[in-house]
Amino acid sequence: MPLRPRSVAVLIAFIITLFLWFKYSRSSSVSSWHYLVTSSKASPEILNATLGFQSIFTINLPSRTDRRDAVTLAAALSGLDITWIDGVASADVPDKVLPGGSTTMKGGNRGSWRAHMNALQRIVEQNMTSALILEDDADWDIRLKSQMQVFAHAAKAFTQPLRSGSGRPLSSKYHDHPAPSISITKLPSPPSPKLTPYGDTWDLLWLGHCGTSFAASAQDGNSIPISPLRVAIPSDPTVPPPRHLKPHPFALTDPLAELYPPHTRVVHLSNGTTCTQAYAVSQQGARKLLYRFGLAERLTKGWDLVLGDWCDRGYHSSVAGDGDSNGGGGAGLPVCVTVQPPLFSHHYGAGGGGKSDISAPGGGFLRVGEGRLEKGMTPYVRWSVRLNMGKLVEGGSSDVEGLVVDQWGEGKEGGLGRGGS
């Protein structure tokens, strides 16, 4: 029976990714990353077309056909299957539907809020175990599926109970430790999760953002019990050199660049995270968010800031069932896991195509083609799908190596696959 066109496209995308990975991952500097991708610790379901989630939703205003075209191609080249959620115009969100009388919410924020509520509503309505929500300006690395396998292993330190029988994950043991950091290679193996390959006791995985901070410990005066545990992923060939670890070209470098060796990615609980290029929710997380911000809370700011406050326990309530006590460390607290640098990031397209319909990071300085930036770019992403899209679609070379370009020009062998600094 002949393969369907979509099956052929997914197969080709997988072969290209596999070829690139093996070509550039043969040095000892990335051996631990390679081991986690190829060993029994890896979750094979993450290699599917929805990254191990039940669905991938992408929010897109119907008028932004340019963005829909770009995401469609990026997903096809990455072997991903996406489902569209129509964006909402602010004019279509009257005061009477805003929760808690949120009449001071700005116009652009209204439409964004409702679109995200519609995505959460779909997840709850269809009783999905988990789903990934993307915004239509998101970009990612060609090696995304391998990245997600490594992330899943690290995330279980916060989302999966240990074998000890305590019913709590590893992170629960580190509330009083000052900034504990554990290498991903030294993590104990928890029982296999039953609900998602990322663990069973999480609410939100914040995978794409424009900034986050490490959680403070109880010793640092943190009044709410949240684990400061950090899981370090060393020698990650997909992490940019330290000087490029910033949310936009005019920003200061992230503290991560000074705190860890080059090419280290760190997974930890969310703290002060902003922007919602990509986040996953579990069924329990979607229900909590839809209730809290679709019905109960008065909103005065953008959805990403609201979501950040929720993960930071700003909306903590003693109401039974409002959160759980696993990864977060206290009864009634949401479990939000993030990663820095992020795995998804905002793409600034050539010719101003990356301009947001709401607002954008960079204080208005990111205007491609207006003397500020000479060409399109994506913070934090080395082998950008969007920046390599033309070459991957047109196939300008019989050698796959010649198709992929690191946007920071770190070189093919030394910088791309082997983590040049």
What residue ranges belong to the model's regions?
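An acidic/histidine-cluster motif and surrounding catalytic segment
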Residues: 2-134, 138-421
